[in-house]
Each structure stands twice: as C-alpha cells, then as structure tokens.
Amino acid sequence: MILQSWHESAFFDTSVSPLAGPPVAAYFLNLRVNQMSSRLDETAVIAALKTLQGWQLARDDEQRPAIEKDYSFTSFNAAFAFMGRVALTAERANHHPELLNRYRRVLVRWTSHSEGGVTALDLELAATCDKLAIDSGLKAQDSSK
C-alpha cells in the first residue's frame, strides 16, 4: 500500500521527510526517545520555562500541569506542515501533545499523563517544537501567549 510504504519510510529511514525542511530525524540528536522522566514540581517548570521563549505553564483538560505555546505562521499550509512535523516527532518519541489549529495558528500543549504533569521530556519536546516552527514558516513576530 502507498500509505504503508510512506509510513515505513518516514519512520525507519531517517533521511526521508514528507514535509519541507530538514528531515525530522535531525531534531532527535539530543532527544531521549521513550525515556519518560519524573514529574517536575511547579517551581522547576517555571524556572525551565525561562529558557523557552513564549512557553507558559498551563493546565490540560483534566487540570494536570502542562506547558503550552501559541504559534503564528505565514499561512495555513505552513501551520499544517508544522503540525505534521510535530506529529512525526511525537510519534518517534512515543509522547504526544495536544495540537489545536486555527487557520495560521497552532496551539501546542505538552504534559505527561502517566506522570500527572510536566516532565523533562515535555520541556525537551517544547524546545524541539520551536526549532520545527522556524523551519516550517513561523511568522517573524511570533504571537506567543
């Protein structure tokens, strides 16, 4: 099947990326795939967020601590490409964010359900999202919260 062939090549051949920009695998150099860490306390999360521009402490739908950022792109296609690249990254890390698309805007929210809050992996994936956003057509003036 075409879909199966694409799926296999996208996840096992790290030189293949179905979306524009560098291969998604380029963002895994420092990512500890499948290594969930312990939940961080709120003070540690707030301190770590100072190194991530535009990310904020939030709550998910079940009121667990989370981190989120609202990105603004140059077009709907750029926003959707970003979401695709985040999805590939999340699948590879076996850790999935909440994504909400509103035309040229994408809200990304990370939390670790199994740990009941934010972990170091969430923070690392947030930093990866920032890199993916730049490569996907992020507006010069990011409309972060």
Located regions from the model:
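N-terminal leader/targeting segments
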Residues: 3, 26, 35-38
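Leucine-biased recognition of intrinsically disordered, low-complexity hydrophobic segments
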Residues: 3, 19, 29-31
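Low-complexity, intrinsically disordered tandem-repeat tracts enriched in small/polar residues
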Residues: 9, 19-22
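Aromatic (phenylalanine/tyrosine) cluster motif
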Residues: 11-12, 27-28
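Glyoxalase I/VOC metalloenzyme domain signal
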Residues: 23-25, 128
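Charge-rich, low-complexity N-terminal segments
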Residues: 31-52, 57, 63-71, 76-107, ...
